Design a protein with these regions (language model features):
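Glycine-rich helix-loop "coupling/hinge" segments at transmembrane-helix boundaries
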Residues: 5-42, 51
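Charged, flexible cofactor/metal-binding loops and thiol motifs
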Residues: 45, 103-107, 120, 252, ...
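The feature captures the beta-strand-to-loop junction immediately N-terminal to the Walker
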Residues: 147-148
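Conserved ABC transporter NBD signature motif
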Residues: 170-181
Length: 418
């Protein structure tokens, strides 16, 4: 509202908005300013200016108050409601699959991970259980795929590893990375680890770049974050080496270009190069091939496989496309409703799926040549379960054609083949 008021005032002051005899903020200020000689004798002529300032500030304060009331976690200043909600953390002890020695020796182990979002609207508080007891581990140099529909908890699980969850997310469980317990780190400690040891790339890479910064400046800022003593020439040399490694042509010339001058596939290559700039050991690729055509998808997948072979890089690859994941990954985790439905090697998941949800995902994947037939594409009936009100037992049971009575019991067990 203040923006509309100021726009109308500016236009009317310039004579492009509301004109006499109608009255507006801009026309009043224009009249008063035009009689500047009288301001000394009649200072009250500036009254419309002060009233305009008071009205716009009042609307701003009202908007801030409403935001703090309906969404306390995103308030600028701490509120009593935010402090009260931060104390509401449930415990889920669960069963430990790994000993403490195994946790500390492993490359990455996620043990009994729960992520709950507290969303407050007015006096109503809703708890959304996005992840409900996820457990998995991976070795150095392994590529782990996570597949599932939107809302399955894939991205939230991996965002907890990188420490990028919002303030209204409560994380429980244990995450060990190279002997370091990530769930016990402060935000400052996470910043030291993020980028240097854990890198992330996301879908729609164009949104990850500042449109006003050249790619060369982005690389310089990233490199100096870990090595402040680097000179401009050294940063440029390192950036060219990284861009050549990810297969971007004319790397040195293109450092002067801005994000809008690159295609989606080229920007994703640049994102991967930036993730490697500080020497990360684990790369989290959250749907990096979304919105890219099939040819570019294959190139990105091939690039990730090459980086694993050359650098010994460990990769978590998230996607909806189970066939694409199987072509790249060593092991696959199938998630739905915040739980792991099934996990195994790529060959086991593709050739011998055991859970009905995995079978449904495979059946709904378009096959080569199917567009030449009149047969309709298979789809999974129903909707994804609501994380705000999870069902007991297997979350896929309401949509499953093979549902049994035991599927709706509390003790859900995922299918493990590794």
């Amino acid at each position: 509202i203040p923006g509309f008021i100021m726009s109308e005032t500016t236009l009317s002051y310039l004579g492009l908005g509301i004109n006499d005899p109608a009255v507006s903020w801009g026309s009043l200020i224009n009249r008063d300013i035009s009689t500047l000689n009288n301001l000394k004798n009649f200072p009250w002529l500036l009254t419309p200016v002060w009233l305009l300032l008071a009205v716009t500030l009042a609307f701003n304060f009202l908007g801030d108050a409403l935001r703090d009331f309906y969404d306390p976690f995103h308030s600028v200043f701490p509120t009593w409601k935010k402090r009260r909600l931060e104390k509401k953390i449930k415990t889920h002890p669960g069963q430990c699959e790994f000993s403490m020695a195994e946790l500390q020796r492993s490359f990455l182990t996620v043990q009994n991970l729960f992520v709950t979002f507290d969303i407050t609207t007015g006096n109503k508080n809703i708890q959304i259980q996005a992840v409900r007891g996820v457990t998995f581990s991976m070795k150095r140099g392994e590529i782990l795929g996570i597949v599932g529909e939107s809302g399955s908890g894939k991205s939230v699980s991996t965002t907890a590893i990188s420490g990028l969850l919002p303030g209204n997310a409560f994380v429980e469980g244990r995450i060990f990375f190279k002997g370091i317990e990530l769930t016990s780190l402060s935000q400052d400690q996470f910043r030291e680890l993020r980028g240097r040891k854990i890198g992330c790339i996301f879908q729609e890479p164009g949104r990850s770049f500042d449109p006003l910064q050249s790619i060369g400046n982005v690389f310089a800022e990233t490199l100096k974050n870990s090595e402040p003593e680097l000179s401009k020439e050294e940063c440029k040399k390192r950036a060219v080496e990284l861009l050549n490694e990810v297969g971007l042509p004319d790397a040195e010339k293109r450092l002067k270009n801005f994000p809008h001058q690159f295609s989606g596939g080229q920007l994703q290559r640049i994102s991967i190069a930036l993730s490697l700039a500080q020497g990360c050991d684990l790369l989290i690729a959250d749907e990096p091939t979304t919105a890219l055509d099939v040819t570019i998808q294959a190139q990105i997948v091939e690039l990730l496989a090459d980086l694993r072979n050359k650098r010994g890089l460990s990769i978590i690859f998230i996607s909806h496309n189970i066939d694409l994941v199987a072509s790249l990954c060593d092991n696959i985790i199938v998630m739905y409703g915040g739980l792991i439905m099934e996990k195994g090697t790529s060959a086991q998941i593709i050739k011998n799926p055991r859970h009905p949800y995995t079978k449904a995902l495979l059946a709904s994947t378009p096959k080569f040549g199917s567009h030449y037939t009149e047969q309709e594409l298979s789809s999974i009936p129903g909707r994804v379960t609501d994380p705000a009100s999870p069902v007991p037992g297997c979350p896929f049971a309401p949509r499953c054609g093979f549902k049994k009575d035991e599927c709706e019991k509390e003790n859900f067990r995922c299918y493990k083949m590794i």
